[in-house]
């Protein structure tokens, strides 16, 4: 019974100690750069730790399908120049940048930080998905099934991340779906149409106002000229009342002369009969 105790202890020692292992998902488009973060805290200034990057899950030791490896100071192996470490190497930033990714770069990647001591490595697993760019299908040319571009996030190198969103352009019937960009375009066209209408209405009102002012000014000037002409005509014509009065006075004097002559002739009728009239025989 006791002979099995050393053997059981040996089996326990051979089992791998638990290491920190996380899996994160990242997405990039074909032809873009993919950024897979991995870092550690440097134990002391100038004391760096070897790391390895491999494609596939982290094995018990080292990395499977190694794409990049470092020692304490330099990169000792690189599968291709597409695999680069662009972080601060001396501050423990071992993030991997894969340039110009293809669909074959999809999969799980293992970042293994090889701290001194048995079974003391720190492992980090990251899942990379590579997608193709969305294809824009013109309206009216799609028949049958359409190409759908779901929103995707592209993480680029650096301290932050850059997000690019692609939207669905057509449904299954080939009908164009209104996107945010289309709504902005339609809104811009509506605004421009409203501005044109407003400018046209304003110009029409201004023209009507100018014509009204000109017509009113012309009418006032013509009315004033007519008034001045009437005053001049009245000033040049003789007064009709005075003319009529003079004519009436002359006729009255003639009648008086006629009456006086008739009276004179009637008083001397005993001597002879004579009738004098101032009127000429017809």
Swiss-Prot record:
Name assigned to this protein: Hepatitis A virus cellular receptor 2 homolog
Stretches that traverse the bilayer: 195-215
InterPro entries linked: Ig-like_dom, Ig-like_dom_sf, Ig-like_fold, Ig_sub, Ig_V-set, Immune_Mod/Transcr_Coactivator
Extra remark: Expression is up-regulated in the spinal cord during experimental autoimmune encephalomyelitis (EAE) and following antigen restimulation of the encephalitogenic TCRBV8S2+ population. Expression was also detected by in situ hybridization in resident cells of the nervous system.
Stretches assigned to the Extracellular side: 22-194
Pfam families: V-set (PF07686)
Topology term for the membrane: Single-pass type I membrane protein
Organism listed in the record: Rattus norvegicus
GO molecular function: metal ion binding; transmembrane signaling receptor activity
Quaternary data: Interacts with HMGB1; impairs HMGB1 binding to B-DNA and likely HMGB1-mediated innate immune response. Interacts with BAG6. Interacts (phosphorylated) with PIK3R1 and PIK3R2. Interacts (not dependent on its phosphorylation status) with FYN. Interacts (in basal state T-cells) with VAV1; AKT1/2, LCP2, ZAP70, SYK, PIK3R1, FYN, SH3BP2 and SH2D2A. Interacts (in activated T-cells) with LCK and PLCG. Interacts with ILF3; this interaction promotes ILF3 ubiquitination and degradation.
Cytoplasmic side: 216-282
Residues noted as binding Ca(2+) in the record, renumbered to the chain: 115, 117, 120
Gene Ontology biological-process annotations: adaptive immune response; cellular response to lipopolysaccharide; defense response to Gram-positive bacterium; inflammatory response; innate immune response; macrophage activation involved in immune response; maternal process involved in female pregnancy; natural killer cell tolerance induction
Cell location: Membrane; Cell junction
GO cellular component: anchoring junction; cell surface; early endosome; immunological synapse; mediator complex; plasma membrane
Residues bearing glycans: 74, 100, 147, 173
Gene: Havcr2
Residues recorded with modification Phosphotyrosine: 257
Predominant subcellular localization, coarse grouping: membrane
